[in-house]
């Protein structure tokens, strides 16, 4: 079902956790390079940039995410080398000009330095400047989130507002007194791919209600008491192609070639067929209700933004499959210069929806362990849902009981009495309790 390119990527993974993490990491990195792709969602056009965070304890393998970087590294390297060449030409031209002579061989301003990657230790001003240099495009990638967490705490480095605004392509601007500088990025297109420990995630998004958290889809790698095979015989291998870094770098060169052909075709619009739209809406409407009922009403923003993320994943999958299948997209470019329309396939729709179903569980888990989260967990760190609390209460009640009895049981378990009263009424409506007489109940 996966596009062939992604099958090749996942063929280099060594565990199920690796496969899930590498799939989302690859989709996120590639999303940062698809600024010529849009799709309509909630009556507006959006680009497919994703935000992704891998949470795991130290030594649990989250560092494998670094190989996803290699898939877009050739694009970054080309941008950087081209910028360095322009800067070299600028400096040489400026040096060769004669004093007092009006020189037209070079521009008065130095060329902008363009890159794909934006360092996590950048100041807020530097992030805006680099996005501006890149035409609004950028990828924040780091396998050690503490670098970003530390810079966000500093007065000059807090660009959390930039992260939140860029998610919805909201304009961001910068004004500095020096040189009377003013920069505005009307439509930032930022992707973020990070990994870190639970403590690093909590530093990045210290509160459950923080708008940053609901924008980031999380994947949690659980602790496993195991040791992988790490030593293998490698005599006579071509190391450039045999090592994981080498194989992913080769995949990066392949992706760069296909993307260049893709860009020669112009710009693209991803369309979700009408028959899938109703299914999408119903799926997330039900998920929203279940999560709000079982976890917390604070999770509604997470579900809504997860739905948006799943739509963006559909856009990325569709674009990758198009690159796999169409070698000369420029032949499809409309004569009027409008966007090439690509319909999302059933496979890519189903894959994205399945990814969303996995991510909601991981994101809920991460949410439940945030400081000040309203979600209850047991001694093993597992989430205690509203349904399990209700079942626990019902099991603790005798076959026949009155209001005073369930009030006492409620207080013993630490549940608000008003909440327990609602649960009792729910069980009556469901036919699991009979309201036999005033203030008296019987299990059925």
Where are these regions (language model features)?
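Phosphate-handling catalytic cores of nucleic-acid transaction enzymes
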Residues: 1-444
């Amino acid at each position: 079902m996966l596009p062939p390119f992604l099958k090749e990527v996942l063929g280099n993974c060594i565990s199920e956790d690796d496969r899930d993490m590498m799939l989302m990491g690859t989709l996120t990195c590639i999303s940062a390079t698809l600024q010529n792709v849009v799709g309509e969602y909630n009556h507006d056009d959006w680009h497919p940039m994703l935000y992704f965070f891998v949470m795991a304890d130290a030594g649990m393998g989250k560092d494998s995410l670094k190989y996803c970087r290699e898939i877009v590294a050739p694009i970054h390297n080309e941008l950087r080398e081209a910028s360095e060449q322009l800067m070299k030409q600028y400096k040489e031209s400026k040096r060769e000009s004669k004093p007092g002579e009006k020189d037209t061989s070079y521009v008065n301003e130095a060329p902008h330095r363009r890159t794909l990657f934006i360092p996590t230790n950048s100041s807020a001003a530097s992030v805006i400047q680099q996005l501006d240099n890149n035409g609004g495009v950028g990828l924040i990638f780091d396998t050690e989130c503490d670098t970003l967490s530390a810079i966000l705490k500093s007065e000059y480095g807090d660009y959390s507002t930039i992260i939140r605004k860029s998610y919805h392509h909201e304009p961001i601007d910068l004004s500095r007194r020096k040189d009377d500088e003013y920069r505005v990025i009307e439509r930032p297109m930022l992707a973020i791919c990070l990994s870190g420990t639970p403590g690093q995630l909590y530093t990045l998004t210290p509160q459950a209600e923080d708008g940053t958290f609901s924008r980031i889809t999380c994947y949690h790698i659980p602790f496993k008491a195991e040791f992988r095979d790490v030593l293998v015989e490698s005599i006579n291998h071509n190391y450039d192609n045999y090592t994981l870094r080498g194989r992913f770098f080769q995949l990066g060169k392949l992706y760069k070639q296909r993307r260049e052909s893709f860009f020669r075709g112009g710009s693209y619009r991803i369309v979700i067929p009408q028959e899938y739209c109703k299914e999408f809406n119903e799926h997330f409407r039900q998920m929203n209700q279940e999560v709000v009922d079982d976890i917390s009403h604070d999770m509604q923003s997470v579900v809504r933004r997860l739905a948006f993320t799943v739509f963006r994943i559909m856009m990325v999958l569709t674009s990758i499959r198009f690159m796999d299948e169409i070698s000369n997209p420029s032949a499809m470019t409309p004569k009027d210069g409008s966007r090439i329309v690509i319909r999302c396939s059933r496979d890519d729709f189903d894959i994205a929806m399945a990814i969303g179903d996995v991510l909601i569980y991981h994101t809920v888990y991460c949410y439940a362990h945030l400081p000040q989260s309203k979600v209850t967990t047991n001694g093993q760190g597992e989430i205690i849902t509203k349904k399990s609390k209700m079942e626990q209460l019902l099991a603790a009640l005798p076959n026949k009981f009155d209001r005073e009895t369930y009030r006492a049981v409620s207080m013993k378990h630490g549940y608000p009495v008003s909440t327990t009263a609602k649960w009792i009424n729910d069980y009556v409506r469901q036919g699991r309790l009979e309201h036999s007489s005033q203030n008296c109940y019987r299990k059925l």
